[in-house]
């Protein structure tokens, strides 16, 4: 069958993915889908280098600010949200551009979701309305009564998971806990994917990370973390352990001692650098992502190269 083309733009933290994507989107009449496991959370702005609202108004973005920090969000959630976003973008004859550095989310998008029923967006909308009317706590209690085993694996704040679980139960009559959630390759996926991996020189990347971490601190990262702690981020293991957040949560928990600031900053930088190594290793396992070194190229040059490839092959 005919497959619509989707652009994938990956790379390690600090490689310039966001800047390139903002140049690329107008060239192909595209909209951006964030492939970042932390940008889904409201309030996690500075530490995730989230683009501003003004930029998002100029270039439409998807999968940003869709969860409260007390909710959990994983690769399965990402898959269904990303597919829905792709369908929406393509229905308006625009081009989906998936941009980010969360390798496992790209893997899930490419390989297909774990086994389980397909989403029922109408039923999901109905459940969302019920959550507004009855409260998410009431829906969680309903889930406890219908599938206590699965309910025990999440919290009463996990709105997305509670709604998805009740969606499955109401649609199929089966418990969520009865399904196998191991990922399988989906050979019949409907998208033709053109993948690119930004791979800057390690020294340039290290320089970018140093600047990035300094800039985040200047913009108020510590105050952002303090606000998120007040909102309950420590109850979300995934969000509270994210690089750029866990280091400063520990700093605040210790009473914000001045003498520990520089050590915490260095830990923040070191952890970010180590993560980029893991990202590069992950993406190089996938031949779909063609490596692109930005050396000697402007952001516009890179965007034009990707756009040219899209028009030739898309």
UniProtKB/Swiss-Prot annotation:
Residue stretches spanning the membrane: none
Keyword RNA-binding: no
Region annotated Interaction with substrate tRNA, chain positions: 36-39
Cofactor(s) annotated in UniProt: Mg(2+)
GO annotation, biological process: tRNA modification
InterPro entries given in the database record: Dimethylallyltransferase, IPT, P-loop_NTPase
Name the UniProt record assigns to this protein: tRNA dimethylallyltransferase
Signal peptide segment: none
EC code(s) of this entry: 2.5.1.75
Gene transcribed to yield this protein: miaA
Record NCBIfam families: miaA (TIGR00174)
Keyword line: ATP-binding, Magnesium, Nucleotide-binding, Transferase, tRNA processing
Protein family: Belongs to the IPP transferase family.
Pfam family, one: IPPT
Keyword ATP-binding applies: yes
Single annotated GO MF: tRNA dimethylallyltransferase activity
PANTHER family: TRNA DIMETHYLALLYLTRANSFERASE (PTHR11088:SF60)
Quaternary data: Monomer.
UniProt organism field: Chlamydia muridarum (strain MoPn / Nigg)
């Amino acid at each position: 069958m005919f497959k619509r083309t989707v652009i994938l733009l990956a790379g390690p933290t600090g490689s310039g993915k966001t800047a390139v994507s903002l140049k690329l989107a107008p060239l192909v009449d595209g909209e951006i889908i964030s492939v970042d496991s932390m940008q889904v959370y409201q309030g996690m702005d500075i530490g995730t280098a989230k683009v501003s609202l003004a930029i998002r108004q100029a270039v439409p973005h998807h999968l940003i600010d869709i969860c409260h920090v007390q909710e959990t969000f994983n690769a399965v959630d990402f898959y269904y949200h990303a597919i829905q976003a792709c369908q929406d973008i393509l229905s308006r004859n625009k081009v989906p551009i998936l941009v980010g550095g969360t390798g496992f989310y790209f893997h899930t998008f490419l390989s297909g979701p774990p086994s389980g029923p397909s989403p029922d967006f109408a039923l999901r909308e109905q459940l969302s309305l019920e959550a507004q009317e009855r409260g998410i706590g009431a829906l969680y209690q309903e889930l406890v009564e219908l599938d206590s085993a699965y309910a025990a694996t999440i919290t009463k704040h996990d709105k997305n998971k509670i709604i998805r679980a009740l969606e499955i139960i109401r649609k199929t009559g089966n418990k969520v806990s009865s399904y196998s959630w191991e990922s399988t390759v989906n050979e019949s996926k409907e998208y033709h994917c053109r993948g690119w991996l930004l791979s800057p020189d390690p020294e340039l990347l290290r320089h970018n990370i140093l600047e990035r971490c300094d800039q985040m601190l200047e913009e108020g990262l510590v105050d952002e973390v303090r606000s998120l702690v007040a909102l309950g981020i420590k109850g979300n293991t995934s969000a509270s352990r994210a690089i750029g957040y866990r280091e400063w949560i520990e700093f605040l928990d210790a009473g914000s001692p001045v003498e520990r600031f520089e050590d915490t900053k260095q830990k923040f930088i070191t952890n970010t650098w180590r993560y980029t190594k893991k990202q590069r290793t992950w993406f190089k396992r996938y031949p779909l992502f063609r490596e692109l070194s930005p050396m000697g190229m402007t952001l516009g040059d890179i965007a034009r190269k990707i756009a040219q490839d899209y028009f030739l092959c898309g």
